[in-house]
Amino acid sequence: MMTAAWSDILHEWCARLITRHPGIRWAMTWCPSVASVASGTGTLLLFRRGIEYFPWFVGYLLLLWLSAVVLAHSRRALAARGRRVVGLVVDYTVQTLTHGLLLFLLPIYYASTTLTSRNVSFLVLLAAAALLTTIDPWYRRTIARFQWVELFLFGFGLFASLNVAFPLLRVRSSWGLHLSGFLSVLALTPVFRRPGIPWRNAILRVGVCSISTAILLWPVRDWIPPVPLRLARATLAKDVTDLEPDLPISQISAADLREWGTLACFTAVDAPAGLREPIYHVWRRNGAVVARVALSPIRGGRLGGFRTYSRKLDLGEGPAFWSVDVLTAHDQLIGRVFLTVTP
């Protein structure tokens, strides 16, 4: 009784204060957004150097995130007990953690995205999720109201972070992609468990969803940037000497190309220390694949990227548009190089 009385008095006092000072309502609406931007920017600045330390950051943040997921699952109980303030604190904590992680991931995925390819869609989705968690009114209207949207955002953020962390732990990207999908769903087990449902049933349901997610990621793998791999340098050239391109070009006449008789594609792929990853050069002429060249596996840790190249001798006649895709062993696009052959 005493608690309820104090709660009513506090609610009435807050209502009067907001009525007398309209600016307080505006501050209550937008201050969480400003705080989210500030915390996310601080996280980004703090970890902008030394991506190798990212797994420690992810481990810390995932611990907080999973705690927030468990708390978010108890919101109904908190609301039933009249502890609305506690529920709001839980919501804000989850929103802030989500925003901080997504904002930190954005530049990492941007560096690995080829803007002229389909994997830019994943970057757009990541940016949209970060924007939704930044603007508090949007978050309340589009995410907090619908639990399935909130769950998707949790799972998406977990997947995006684990997809970066596994290669840094020297896990091949082909394995890391599926492990990320599996664990990102498995981590939501506390949310899938409803009152009256045994843990065994919840784990079984989540296990099926986790395995399904890992399998479904295979056909859409080329829509996902191969983080943290990125193309540090890339060019087509007359030749490569001592792992440096000779006469790099982006355009050449058909006569000059005929005189050269060969083209070389030089690429330098930046990768974290300790990672070994097979890569391929896929040559295309006017959109048609004319060669797929397996290269030496890249070894991460070199400043400026691991350098490698491939050559093409049969160049055809006349004007053409050449492109070379740099792919991982399971066809994720690291980058793309173009060359225009003029008449």
For each of these PLM feature ranges, what is it?
Residues Q147-R194:
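Membrane-embedded alpha-helical segments of integral membrane proteins
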Residues L216-R258, T340-P343:
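Short, compositionally biased P/S/T/A/G/V-rich stretches that sit at domain boundaries
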Residues M1-I135:
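Membrane-anchoring hydrophobic segments
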Residues G300-K312:
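Aromatic sugar-binding surface patches on proteins
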Residues I197-V227:
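Internal/C-terminal transmembrane anchor helices
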Residues A264-A271:
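Short edge beta-strand/loop segments characteristic of extracellular beta-sandwich folds
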Residues A291-G301:
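Solvent-exposed serine/threonine-rich low-complexity stretches and specific carbohydrate-binding patches
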Residues L327-V337:
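Short acidic/polar inter-strand loop motif in beta-rich domains
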